[in-house]
Amino acid sequence: FIPAINEIIQRAGGYGTKEMVIGMAHRGRLNLLVNILGKNPADLFDEFDGKVQPEKGSGDVKYHNGFSSNVMTPGGEAHLALAFNPSHLEIVAPVLQGSVRARQVRRNDQPLQDNKTGNSVLPIVIHGDAAFAGQGVVQETFQMSQTRAYTTGGTVHIVINNQVGFTTSRQEDA
């Protein structure tokens, strides 16, 4: 999944996308932080060792924290943001859509207005296979996606089929 994300970022940047906002649950998050967003592994381990105190609030599960960085693409520098993630699977999806829409408005690039495309900001949502199929918020977010006030012009959805969330065996394995 890391090579796929990297390819999406590089191609989107090559087409002129200036920001990409990623939403995902915990599985694969640390890998993405280090290998895509460029977070220093030493800093990551310091957070887990308790050497870094949160600036405000009571703290959260370490792998729920967000992060942002800039990367070079064929089209120039692009800003990447990994959204903070609550423990409720898939709830990050509508939050991410709102964040992207706000960024598009800030850039005066909201889709469906004055022939704008919204291509300056790309939402990317990474789902686990069980959560994608089982959480109604995914379909509810799809339902909002084409309404005038909520559309972002399209979202890249990646479903990771890790078969961890399902409790029944595959028929071939039974």
What are these regions (language model features)?
Residues 1-156, 160-173:
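Conserved internal helical-beta-strand scaffold that buttresses enzyme catalytic cores
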